[in-house]
Amino acid sequence: MPNLQQTASQSQHHLYPPHLRPHHHHQQQQHHQQQQQQQHTHHQQQQQHHSDFPLPDGWDIAKDFDGKTYYIDHINKKTTWLDPRDCYTKPQTFEDCVGDELPMGWEESYDPNIGPYYINHLAQSTQLEDPRQEWKTVQEQMLSDYLSAAQDQLENKREMLDVKQQRLLWAQEEYNHLKLAASRSSLCSSSSSMSRHDPELLRADLMLARERVHQLKQELTHITNDISYTERGMNTLYSVGEKINARENGCYDIAEVQAIREEMLKVHKSLVSGEKVREELMRSLVQIKNELGRQQISEENSDLASPFDRVCVASQTDLCGSSGDNLNGGARFAEMAKTKLQYAEWRKHIKKLQQQLADHVERIEPGQLESDKDRILLIQEKEKLLNDLNSISLKSRSEEEKRVIHQTRHKLEEDLKEAYEANNTCVANRLRFHEEKQLLLDKLQEALKSTKLLEERLKSFSSESTFSISSGSSLGSLSTASSKSALSFTDIYIDPFAVDSPIDVVDLRRRSQRLFQQHQQQRLLPVHPVLQQQQSAEVTLSPRSSLSMETPPASPMKYNAGADQTPQALKEEPTYANALPAPPAYTAPPPVPISGVRARPYDLDSTVLDCMMLEAKLQKLNMGTPLNLAAAPLSPISEKPSLLDLPQEMLSRSSSTSNTRSVSAAVSNESVAGDSGVFEASRAHLPRKELAQVQIGLKYLKQEGVLVVSLERANNLLALWTASADNSQVYLRAALLPNSLTSIRTKALGDFQKPFFNDTFAVPITLDKLLTKSLQVTVVTMTGQKEEIIGTVQISMAEFNPEDSTLKWYNVLSSKFIPSFESLDIPSTSAAAAAAAVAASNAPSSGNNREESSDESTITSSQTSTLTRNQAPCMELQEQITAELLELGPLNEPECSDDDDEDEEEELDDKQLVSDVGLMNSSGMLDAYLQNMKQEFADKETNTDRAYLPEKSRGQSQLMDDRPVKRSQTFTPSAAVSKNRYNCRLNRSDSDSAMHCGVAPHTFQRGAAERRSLRFHTKAPKSVTKLHHTHIPRTSLDLELDLQAQHSKLYFLNDQIAKLQNLKEVLQKACENKDPLVAAWAIENEEFQRLVARADPAKCPEERQLQKLLMKTAKEIHKLRKTKVPKGCPDLVSFKEKITFFTRKGLSVPELPSEFTLPEANPIEEEEEEEDEDEFYNSPETAIAINTALVASSNRNKNLSEHPHRSTSGAVPKLPAPVATPAATPAATPAATPVATPAATPVVATAAQPEAKPAAAPIPVASNDAEQQRFDYVVDRNYGVEV
């Protein structure tokens, strides 16, 4: 091999050889001959490789120090990266390429930060675009078309500005007329006969005219800001198009792409820090607004309490007990199975709504809704101008003024008629699609709310404790300030603060059409003014209105249903099932809630609702008789009587308007809830008797290691006992479950109304074991030798505080609520018998080897005692929950994504969002529950000892390792069975139905090597199951748009921060000076209220979580829509969203008006000056100027309609100079900007070049002149280009 240094001494080493630049004559002839030879043997050469051909004479192969192969031409003493044999194996042009081939001289390479890029060795250049695709041309055409449409939209905004200015001129003229009349009336006030007008009416009209002028000035400012925003966005798009067209091939090389990427990351860091500053400023504004509200209220009436001072009593009581604790094991089992089934259905419903929204995005053009809104607003402005002209009195006008006004009216009527005809044909379909999208969004929001409620309910089940009131769990951070190496589409173009609350365009169009129809009717058939006023003053009272009821109802009950409700809604009981909107199982999605009737499950008693749900499910499964709700207990959390049985006259007085969950006083005066003083007073005259309760005291002695249980007294046990209490007695029995070998009992008493037991027991137990137990107290009656359990109380010791002693009243759950309760035929009532029953039920047993009670009694029918039968399913259930929750995925897990880093970040958010919440196999839970509840009805040929649990739950549960596997007697009893691999689930027969009934994750494969994998298929890792989408090509235009979008966001963020700082300073000064005008503006201004509502710390945590869920759902919808793009095809909708981002309205920060009111009219003013001013505003020249402006605006629109298409060939035309407006230059000063942002000009620095330091000034938009100074060009030997 020739020496590389010798060949490099006479040529440029590591550069492209000169024979790839202008060739010599003999080299051109040789190259031409090679082309002709290659055309004859093209088909054969495609099947050959480099190894099939030897290197030409004088050529050699070498490798660089980094392993890159290059070729040496010893004849010409040059080096090259090109293989000289490519002329035999590769096509010469793109037309000759087959499939994914690249022609000779092209190479595809990969950069870990940028991705794939392409090298043109012939032209010594690199580019980001794939040369085989024409996506760049399509993008340029789309950009040109959008700029043409945006120009029309801008013209509509400017025409709207002209109409608004005309309205302001007429309003100012009317105001000056009224001011002059009020001045003359004040001068002639000494004699009422000399006054032609009532002074009081003149002052009222003057006040209305002044407010109207002020309102029009504010609207004019908003339109001016909109125009300046749109103009800036269009100028940015024009500059992007010109910059791309100015390139030699319209592409950035790889070094420029790398520099742009680094610049985007720097700007993104500045955006993250700026957003934190903006949020802090908005929180400060919330505090200042609240302080101004307090000052205003204190000035008006110091005796009234401030509405901002609220006291939350949610954490002042020990809230314990819930429906889950009051229900025994079987009911709790079925209730959780049903809740998880609802949760699964809601997850499916959310996925379906997301898919429908992804489909709707393709039907609605991005930016088209904004254009339709501008058209409708323009029509509405012209209607208002026409109404203003119609309201002008013509009595004091000259003939010339009357003629101008009539011409202007006629012109406006013709324009409105043409606009309505055009809009009715082209806007109707788009608005229909938009209305459907809004309906889907509303359904999605309701679905997320319901799912969040179900998640909280599942958390209470999974923790084996009662419901608790908390401040809300952390959802994790959705900030994009992570250490990701690249920015995704959603990071740049989806921003929760980027867009204001949208205007309801559908309602706006309907209102505009209604005004037009009324105007047409008035022209055809004039209406008497008095009748017209009566028609407009009609008020429709809602059935939920406070005018038609004594007090607002607490919840939409069946008694106060209005006429607008459907018959189905009238028949529905206010149970938990219809209070919490849930989709029907495996059917269509839920219907839209009835307007005016909003479900509030917190207004109803949770225990009653849970039992009603259980009753409905049990009746559906034919598992028992209907439950008796006459003795429905009260939960310790909400000791409020159920509203189901209240009559109408009491229902209207027993409701609460508070937004918190009201808790009334307990039944007994010794109740903790009653003594706490934070509950509402108990309702005295209830149409039902009181419910059964027991008073239990608990205290733990740490030194002795003993739990002291005091069973003090009970109240109204007759509610549980329907038989005669003459010859019966009652006592209490308690045990610590599970695995308790001893139980305690009180003495038997004959008083069922208020028995006083006063028995204290000491149970030795360690503290760590105590916290894992639950205390179960049962109420047992004795009639002769027969005992019967009539109620039970279950207390979780997990929330017991060993440092303190408690004495509380607990509600007793009647045995009638659970069909599994049965009578106990026990001859003796000793405590040893009950302890033996507990021990027999919890001890391990297998086959016929079963421990039985050896005491005075045995349990009949080979069943466990009622105590342990009610408790064991609950413990097995908890173990199954713990195992299931570890293997289930989060809510709304994204199925596909192009950005792995974004997926990882959202996975962390999901895990924090729905921690300890999962989805169990509900059908398996119900099957297990059926086997527990109907154990005695099992087939006698099948020995069903105990309910079967899946293998994955048994593997993680230590308490159930020693229990036998449920088997059929038809299998060989002596066969050795290993629980770790024996996972056959038996049904009632020994046929193939005994196999696993789950749905296989793959199709059946006969003769598969691993047949056992078809039984229980483990969940594949996420990296395998995730659908990896094909690479969507990116172009230089995409990259430049992303960079300019980041700069635009930073520019407007700096502008918002400057305005917020200015607003904060003004409001602070007004708060210190107690300025009533500024305080009134801060409280009454709707725009300011919407701004501070975004960062109000008093907002409900659930609302914040819902907003984050909606934001996350928007990202998932974008991912779903990307998966619908065909393989290898560009995403047209995403590119349209990119270019519409620049003309989309951002977050508007209100500005304090310079003058809150116009100056009052001075009645002592000289009359001559007023007459001169009156002559100026009433002169016909002013009216003619207004008419001229209208005609000019109409001619401009006519020219635009005659030339709808503009020439877009060549360079993109420059936007004409914008109209000079006061808000054309946003007030973003460097001094008022606290965000430290990096320099706008990135430099590809060498090793010795220091990095650019951050500057305090905002990053300006990159200009065309700064492009030449962006890079220092050097020669890169790896890429072979100048960078």
Swiss-Prot record:
Where, per UniProt, does this protein localize? Cytoplasm; Apical cell membrane
Q: Which GO terms describe its cellular component?
A: apicomedial cortex; cell-cell junction; cytoplasmic side of apical plasma membrane; Kibra-Ex-Mer complex
Query: Do you know which PROSITE patterns this protein is assigned to?
Result: C2, WW_DOMAIN_1, WW_DOMAIN_2
Annotated function: Regulator of the Hippo/SWH (Sav/Wts/Hpo) signaling pathway, a signaling pathway that plays a pivotal role in organ size control and tumor suppression by restricting proliferation and promoting apoptosis. The core of this pathway is composed of a kinase cascade wherein Hippo (Hpo), in complex with its regulatory protein Salvador (Sav), phosphorylates and activates Warts (Wts) in complex with its regulatory protein Mats, which in turn phosphorylates and inactivates the Yorkie (Yki) oncoprotein. Kibra acts synergistically along with Ex and Mer to regulate the Hippo signaling pathway.
- Which species is this UniProt entry from? Drosophila erecta
UniProt region (Disordered), positions on chain: 1-59, 537-559, 840-871, 887-910, 941-969, 1197-1263
Indicate the family of this protein: Belongs to the WWC family. KIBRA subfamily.
Point out the coiled-coil segments of this chain: 200-228, 334-462, 1048-1075
Biased amino acid composition, Basic residues: 20-29
Instruction: Identify the SMART domains for this entry.
Output: C2, WW
Instruction: Cite the record's note on assembly.
Output: Forms a complex with Mer and Ex. Interacts (via domain WW 1) with Ex (via RXPPXY motif). Interacts with Mer, Sav, Hpo and Wts.
Residue stretches of biased makeup (Acidic residues): 895-909
Q: Domain named C2: which ranges?
A: 690-810
Q: Where is the composition biased (Polar residues)?
A: 1-13, 537-549
Q: What is this protein called?
A: Protein kibra
